[in-house]
Amino acid sequence: MHPIPDVTPAARRARWGVILLFWLNGAAAASIIPRYPEIKSRLVIDDQWWGLLIALAPLGGLVAGLVTAALIRRFSSATVAVVFQAVSVAMLSLIGNASVAWMLAAGVFLMAAGDALTDIAMNAHGLRVQRLYQRPILNSFHGWWSIGAVCGGLLGSAAKQGGVPIWLQCLIAAGAFVVMALGAKSLLLPGKDHDPAASQAGG
């Protein structure tokens, strides 16, 4: 048997930072889903146009995915993940307060674009942390995404059942999620991903 390698405090902190990003990523996206029928009804959007509007989400992700690698090389996976997670969750406020269909479309597109950038960057950072642990831990991060999605769905459902206005739910959720996303930065590994010294950071 091989001995379990020592894990530094910095690596442990970074693991919790990545966990927080994965949890937020799942929670933010799922929190608005229970309110979609109300939004659709409020804006008087028929089924055909609603389907096209929701299709903007994968389009936003596709467009954002084209530039993610370049952004990570320029700024680091930690910075890209945190900044675009904050941007993505902030779009909840735009979605929840949309008074016309184009505002909702913009919110859906931008949230999905930020989500795609975050998804790639937080996985890249998770791989950095995994290298410090010297054992597979990446799957556990995806487990936390699933937990976040369940929590977000429950949050949205509870707000709906409790009669909380959509705009208020989204405003509070966006504010709280942005603070949490920015707070994750202090936990993550410093330096650029391609910097050998940064990759070994663990003290």
Q: What does each of the following model-derived ranges do?
A:
Residues 7-41, 109-110, 203:
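Pair of pore-lining "gating" transmembrane helices in MFS-fold secondary transporters
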Residues 20, 91, 102-111:
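Paired small-residue
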Residues 44, 76, 97-102:
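Helix-breaking motifs and short loop linkers at transmembrane-helix boundaries and internal kinks
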Residues 57-59, 146-151:
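Short hydrophobic/small-residue motifs within alpha-helical transmembrane segments
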Residues 62-77, 160:
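Helix-to-loop junctions at the C-terminal end of transmembrane segments
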Residues 79-94, 102, 174:
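Structural signature of the two symmetry-related core transmembrane helices
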Residues 107-144:
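Cytoplasmic helix-loop-helix junction between adjacent transmembrane helices
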Residues 167-186:
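Symmetry-related core transmembrane helices of the 12-TM Major Facilitator Superfamily/SLC fold
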